[in-house]
């Protein structure tokens, strides 16, 4: 069982803020030196993220797969008032937090497309040294290092980099661009927060956006529907930020990047120079070139007193093989039913 929970802040979900960070970097054609210095002063380095990991999946050495990149993105459910990311955050401590949401971001070798793959936090998996458990327990048990090891063992995909993101940044960006429009197809009621969402279009500020993407109760598929909401909101957020707001005010990109770097922590092998080069390589990536999906599952169930998500071994193997071989475009064509639609429950 995971360490006992202490007082905890209301859980905030993760949407792929890393994608925002990298794509916004790509939009900045000037001010690179200023940007690097600003990010370097704001961002926290996570020590020993990959230290001591053995029997890791091989890194492809030929074809487009050799140039592809896999980034594990985590958001944490904190148990204290201390910041969990950014330069002012303390180091990881056992039991302080679990990874509330987990994404594997695959950047194709040609950098013309990307995939954001959600791994449900309740996925029942093997955690090295701890037996079976929910995938989000790994962060509580052993921090970034054990989380990377757990995901690599589960997927047989080599993780190139890790980032942990604070959800205050999600709220701040939503407010910074003046809110985001979202369509709700059917009226739903969130009994946990006493919020009723009427069918139709809603213009959400940062606080409202958090309520929207955090809802689980009242949705047909619970946590899986919440993951779909997070992905759909991210797609809208990125599109509005990059294709509307920054066209009207290109200089705003530096302010947005400075804001986001305050809420991010990355592995200590990932230098600011490397991040800048990656950002430049993504300059032609459009929001329509990003696919969103959830790892295939086989429903939910109970293990003892734990509500868990059961993964689908057969379809999962096909997905992770496509990631390793940098064939996500072909995989998506054959698995349209697993892609997150623009409008979700």
Indicate where each model-derived feature is located:
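N-terminal hydrophobic targeting segments that direct proteins to the cell envelope
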Residues: 3-97
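Extracytoplasmic/secreted envelope proteins and their assembly/folding machinery
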Residues: 47, 99-101, 132, 136, ...
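N-terminal post-signal-peptidase region of extra-cytosolic proteins
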Residues: 50-60, 82-103, 137-154, 158-159, ...
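C-terminal solvent-exposed extensions
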Residues: 46, 56, 82, 204, ...
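Flexible, polar/acidic helix-loop-strand segments at domain edges
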Residues: 69, 173-251, 264, 344
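Second-shell loop/turn segments in exported
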Residues: 90-93, 133-141, 156-161, 199, ...
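Amphipathic, coiled-coil-like alpha-helical scaffolding segments used for oligomerization/assembly
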Residues: 135-196
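Extracytoplasmic
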Residues: 66-69, 97-102, 111-119, 130-132, ...
């Amino acid at each position: 069982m995971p360490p006992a929970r202490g007082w905890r802040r209301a859980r905030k979900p993760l949407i792929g803020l890393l994608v925002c960070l990298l794509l916004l970097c790509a939009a900045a054609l000037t001010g690179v030196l200023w940007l690097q210095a600003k990010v370097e002063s704001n961002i926290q380095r996570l020590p020993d993220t990959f230290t001591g990991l053995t029997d890791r999946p091989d890194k492809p050495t030929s074809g487009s797969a050799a140039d592809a990149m896999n980034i594990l993105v985590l958001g944490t459910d904190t148990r204290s008032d201390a910041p969990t990311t950014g330069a002012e955050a303390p180091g990881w401590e056992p039991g302080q937090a679990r990874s509330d949401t987990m994404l594997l971001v695959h950047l194709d070798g040609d950098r013309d497309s990307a995939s954001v793959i959600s791994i449900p936090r309740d996925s029942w998996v093997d955690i090295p040294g701890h037996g079976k458990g929910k995938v989000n327990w790994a962060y509580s048990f052993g921090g970034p290092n054990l989380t990377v090891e757990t995901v690599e063992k589960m997927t047989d995909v080599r993780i190139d980099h890790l980032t942990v993101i604070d959800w205050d940044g999600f709220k701040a960006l939503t407010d910074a661009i003046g809110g985001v429009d979202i369509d709700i197809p059917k009226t739903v009621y969130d009994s946990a927060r006493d919020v009723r969402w009427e069918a139709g279009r809603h213009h959400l500020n940062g606080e409202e956006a958090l309520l929207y993407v955090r809802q689980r109760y009242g949705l047909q598929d619970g946590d899986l529907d919440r993951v779909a909401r997070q992905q759909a909101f991210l797609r809208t957020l990125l599109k509005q930020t990059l294709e509307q707001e920054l066209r009207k005010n290109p200089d705003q990109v530096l302010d947005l990047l400075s804001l986001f770097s305050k809420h991010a922590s990355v592995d200590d092998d990932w230098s600011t120079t490397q991040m800048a080069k990656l950002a430049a390589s993504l300059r032609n990536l459009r929001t329509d070139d990003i696919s969103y999906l959830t790892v295939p599952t086989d429903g939910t169930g109970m293990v003892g007193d734990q509500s868990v998500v059961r993964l689908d071994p057969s379809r999962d193997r096909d997905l992770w093989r496509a990631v390793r071989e940098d064939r996500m475009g072909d995989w998506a064509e054959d698995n349209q039913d697993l892609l997150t639609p623009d409008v979700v429950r």
